[in-house]
Each structure stands twice: as structure tokens, then as C-alpha cells.
């Protein structure tokens, strides 16, 4: 080990940096909780008072603004470094499915912070959460508890001109570089006849990944980078397309920064074909 790291003069710096990391961790959690709870409280009366043609645009604008402010605050205090500018080119591209990989809980926050007309399929426990539920309902986000209803609502949102955020893995990544992909993305795109825009989220940290304790301090700053992948036409055969999409993600992310533990399972080497 480098002797300089063990020298007495380095100890104060290391302790100060550790204290800063704890401050940044708690600041981020409290700030996100405050933003979410404030908007959720305001969303309840708005949901019942305003007509739906107003509530959905208002709800999505507010969530985009809140998430963008939150990420800006994390950047300002030096906790994270975000490169999300690639998403800006999608804003005026019309209805499509935006399909990123899913390394951590901040993935949806990052995407929605840049795309204000985004519908989102959410887990039931998030929609029912006191911090997020009312705001999610105001924005017209879709519950994933009943698959047939979920697919119908997703297709309807796309037909109304919304963009739709779906994580093809269905949950946060536990197999390097991506989990097995689910068929929902291809099925919805096929029925709505919209393209699928792949998005790659790269990070150097396992923070808020699957199994990461909420209050565990990560090394900071954390880097997040988003880049756009290929945009695919609506698939004709959902099953075959899903397998090809998974191989495409594997090939594109194989050399990305490795954030999973060394003993995490690995996807088999492959070369995407037929896309």
C-alpha cells in the first residue's frame, strides 16, 4: 500500500472526505424526500380539481423539473458527475419507447429529468408510496400489477404522443453487463407501432444498485454517463426481437465500467446478429 496513504498527515484529509461523503449521502436522500413529499402533497388536490388534459402535462413537467433540480444539487455539492446531454436529442422525436439498461435506482430520475413528456411503467409499491404515489398518478404513470391493463395503458399513452420509459431487464442489473431481458418492451412497441430507442447508462459505482442498502455510504464523486444506442423499428416477432435486443445490450456494454461485485454472474459472450 502507498506509504503516503498511511502517513499521519493524510489521516485528516481522509476523515474529512469521509465526513463529506456522509453529508452528501444524507443531503441527497433528504432533498429527494423533501421534493417528492412536497409535490405528492400538492398533487392530491390537483388530481381531483383539475381536468385530466391539464393534470398529466403539469404532473410530468413538475417531476421533470424536480428531478433536474435534484440532480443539479448533487452535481453542485460534488457528490455526482452527470453527462446526460445525449437524451436531449430525443425530446422532440415523437412517441417511442426509451429502453435503458438499469444499473441503479437513479436511472429513471436521470432519464425523466431530460424528457418531460415521458410516461413510465412503475412497480406497485412505488405508485403506492407516500412520497411518490400521488405525483405518479397525477403524471399518468402506469402500474405494473396487471399485465394486460398495463400493456393497454402503455399503448394508449404512445398513441396519444407520449414517450414511454421501459427497462427491458425489468429490474436492476445483477448479471454483468445486463440481466435477461423481458418481452414487454417488444410487445408494447409491436402493438403501438413505435420505435425502440436503446439507451446505455454507464456508472463507476454500485450505489443504489440491487441489494445496496439505502443508507450505505458510497465513494464519491460518482460518475454517470448516458449514451444513445440504436433505434429499432417496431418488431414483427416479439420473442425473437427480445433475444436479439439482449445480445445487443451485452455487446454494447461489455466494456463499460464494471460496477457489479467480482463474483456477480456474467452473460455469455456473443455477437448480436439479425438486428
For the regions a language model picked out, list residue spans one by one.
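Short glycine/serine/threonine/alanine-rich loop segments
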Residues: 80, 141, 194
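Short, conserved catalytic or adaptor-binding loops enriched in Gly and charged residues
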Residues: 73-75, 134-135, 217-220
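Short gly/ser/thr-rich secondary-structure transition/capping motifs
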Residues: 77-85, 144-148, 208-211
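Structural alpha-helical scaffold elements that stabilize or flank donor/cofactor-binding regions
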Residues: 90, 135-136, 157, 188
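Non-catalytic C-terminal accessory region of glycerolipid acyltransferases
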Residues: 2-15, 148-275
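Membrane-anchoring hydrophobic helices of lipid-metabolizing enzymes
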Residues: 2-96
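Catalytic core of membrane glycerolipid acyltransferases/transacylases, capturing the structured
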Residues: 44-68, 76-77, 92-146
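Alpha-helical membrane-embedding segments
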Residues: 85-101, 131, 154-156, 221-223, ...
Amino acid at each position: 500500500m502507498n506509504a503516503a496513504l498511511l502517513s499521519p498527515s493524510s489521516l485528516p484529509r481522509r476523515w474529512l472526505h469521509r465526513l463529506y461523503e456522509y453529508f452528501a449521502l444524507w443531503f441527497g436522500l433528504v432533498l429527494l424526500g423533501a421534493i417528492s413529499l412536497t409535490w405528492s402533497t400538492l398533487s392530491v388536490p390537483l388530481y381531483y380539481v383539475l381536468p385530466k388534459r391539464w393534470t398529466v402535462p403539469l404532473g410530468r413537467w413538475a417531476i421533470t423539473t424536480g428531478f433536474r433540480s435534484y440532480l443539479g444539487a448533487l452535481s453542485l455539492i460534488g457528490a455526482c458527475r452527470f453527462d446526460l446531454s445525449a437524451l436531449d436529442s430525443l425530446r422532440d422525436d415523437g412517441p417511442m419507447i426509451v429502453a435503458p439498461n438499469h444499473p441503479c435506482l437513479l436511472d429513471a430520475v436521470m432519464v425523466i429529468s431530460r424528457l418531460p413528456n415521458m410516461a413510465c411503467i412503475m412497480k406497485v409499491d412505488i405508485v403506492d408510496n407516500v412520497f411518490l404515489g400521488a405525483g405518479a398518478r397525477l403524471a399518468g404513470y402506469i402500474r405494473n400489477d396487471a399485465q394486460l391493463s398495463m400493456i393497454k395503458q402503455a399503448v394508449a399513452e404512445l398513441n396519444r404522443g407520449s414517450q414511454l420509459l421501459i427497462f427491458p431487464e425489468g429490474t436492476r442489473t445483477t448479471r454483468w453487463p445486463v440481466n435477461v431481458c423481458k418481452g414487454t418492451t417488444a410487445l408494447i412497441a409491436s402493438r403501438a407501432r413505435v420505435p425502440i430507442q436503446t439507451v446505455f447508462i454507464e456508472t463507476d459505482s454500485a450505489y443504489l444498485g440491487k441489494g445496496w442498502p439505502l443508507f450505505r455510504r458510497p465513494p464519491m464523486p460518482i460518475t454517470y454517463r448516458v449514451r444513445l444506442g440504436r433505434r429499432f423499428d417496431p418488431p414483427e416477432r416479439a420473442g425473437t426481437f427480445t433475444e436479439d435486443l439482449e445480445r445487443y445490450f451485452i455487446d454494447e456494454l461489455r466494456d463499460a465500467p464494471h460496477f457489479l461485485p467480482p463474483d456477480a454472474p456474467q452473460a455469455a459472450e456473443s455477437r448480436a446478429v439479425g438486428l
